[in-house]
Curated annotation (Swiss-Prot):
Could be involved in insertion of integral membrane proteins into the membrane. It comes from the Bacteria. This is Putative membrane protein insertion efficiency factor. It is found in: Cell inner membrane. Belongs to the UPF0161 family. Residues 61-81 are annotated as: Disordered. Signal peptide: none annotated. It is a peripheral membrane protein. Keywords: Cell inner membrane, Cell membrane, Membrane. GO terms for cellular component: plasma membrane. It comes from Pseudomonas entomophila (strain L48).
Length: 81
């Protein structure tokens, strides 16, 4: 399911985005952010992170560097230490 959700993002990145002028206020771009978020966090959490990012992409936001948050580590590794 995750790979299926990434197909439209890849299509946008490689077929539509090059035809448009670069308008993204953030680094990485919103499409790269969405791809990485879904890849690292899964469809639900990654999709939610992507929607939140798109909500921040507007003229009143300065933008800048906004990386995908790291995936939560396993709780068992912190208990074992």
């Amino acid at each position: 399911m995750r790979k299926l959700a990434l197909v439209p993002i890849q299509f946008y990145r490689y077929a539509i985005s090059p035809l448009m002028a670069s308008h993204c206020r953030f680094y990485p771009s919103c499409s790269c952010y969405a791809y990485e978020a879904i890849e690292n966090h899964g469809l639900l959490r990654g999709g939610w992170l992507a929607v939140r990012r798109l909500g921040r992409c507007h003229p009143w936001n300065d933008g800048g560097f906004d990386p995908v948050p790291p995936a939560p580590s396993s709780r068992t590794s912190s208990i074992a230490e």
